[in-house]
């Protein structure tokens, strides 16, 4: 028995791994940007920070996955957008600190290496990188028979960005009276899916629920997470934003306080929040308490900005999209987030 045959008999297909690398090269090439050094396949991805032109550079990093949304991608055999979700979860976190994404690395583990499927996943990662302006400079695809079922895989990513030291957003600039501006989400994004899957467990993916405005359930559930980098970065560059909250796991209640100091609180005006149909459906079909919805989901606002009142007009001008004035920063008396 040759070593190659022995490895194949253990469930690892080396040739399929080589095929994946060849398939993804064209997708990786789409993401190239100034600063990238070396070619795909090296032991480490390289990036030349001097190409960024940042005078006092601070590197800001983030890592994340897509949770059990991945189980729906597998269930519905739709793998071309889940990679964008992974990128979004990472780069939206670092833009909240004022960072411009520079590069991204992905990690895929699977029970059986299926090149066509994994190409779709990486194509989605590349699309997310293009939207974020980040280079896909490396990654790992691990075939792990026995650890995962043949049809299963897991996906995680790691993003690194850069900011001028003077433009870091860390909550210290937010003050009483700042206006809270909300940017629309594209849907559920990539958190809360253990609950989402339970609520819709008895519905087919093709189901058309009246609340979802004619869209198939699986289309709504797998809607890619919006990437906010290109919308928000110009605001950071002009020093127009005091605080940013990426509304992910924990909803408004957990994430909004992360952008200001402990003596402050956020007053949210619920009637100003553009609640998406999917959240109304989740609340109804899942019999979820209304208040709890704001503790789990983004409710239609995927990113929140704290902005001085005199800067609101300029922020709206630069964003060139619907911007929702959904609250203000107040002195904290009890709770960190008050939804009125």
UniProtKB/Swiss-Prot annotation:
Catalytic activity: 2-formamido-N(1)-(5-O-phospho-beta-D-ribosyl)acetamidine + ATP = 5-amino-1-(5-phospho-beta-D-ribosyl)imidazole + ADP + phosphate + H(+)
Main localisation: cytoplasm
Origin superkingdom: Bacteria
GO BP annotations, alphabetical order: 'de novo' IMP biosynthetic process; adenine biosynthetic process
CDD domains referenced in this protein's UniProt entry, alphabetically: PurM
Major enzyme class: ligase
Places the protein is found: Cytoplasm
Family of this protein: Belongs to the AIR synthase family.
Official protein name in the record: Phosphoribosylformylglycinamidine cyclo-ligase
Native source organism of the sequence: Streptococcus uberis (strain ATCC BAA-854 / 0140J)
Classification of source organism: Bacteria, Bacillati, Bacillota, Bacilli, Lactobacillales
